[in-house]
């Protein structure tokens, strides 16, 4: 997900997106722990998307 797409969303939409990403991260971690995860790069992508969303939420709260 691109940061420019995230900047267009409201804070409520970003919080919803963040919850979805956190759930996805949890599921990926469980799959990784049980050896079912084949694309381990997904963990990295989700972690970075979480950071993007949190950064934009913080910048909107400060503005």
Swiss-Prot record:
It comes from the Bacteria. Transmembrane segments: none annotated. One of its GO terms (biological process) is translation. PROSITE patterns: RIBOSOMAL_L29. The keyword DNA damage does not apply. InterPro entries: Ribosomal_protein_uL29, Ribosomal_uL29, Ribosomal_uL29_CS, Ribosomal_uL29_sf. Disulfide bonds: none annotated. Keywords: Ribonucleoprotein, Ribosomal protein. One of its GO terms (molecular function) is structural constituent of ribosome. One of its GO terms (cellular component) is cytosolic large ribosomal subunit. NCBIfam families: L29 (TIGR00012). Belongs to the universal ribosomal protein uL29 family. HAMAP family: Ribosomal_uL29. This is Large ribosomal subunit protein uL29.
């Amino acid at each position: 997900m691109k940061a420019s797409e995230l900047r267009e969303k409201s804070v409520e939409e970003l919080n919803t997106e963040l919850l979805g990403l956190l759930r996805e991260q949890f599921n990926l971690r469980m799959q990784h722990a049980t050896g079912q995860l084949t694309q381990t790069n997904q963990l990295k992508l989700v972690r970075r998307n979480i950071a993007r969303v949190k950064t934009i939420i913080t910048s909107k709260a400060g503005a």
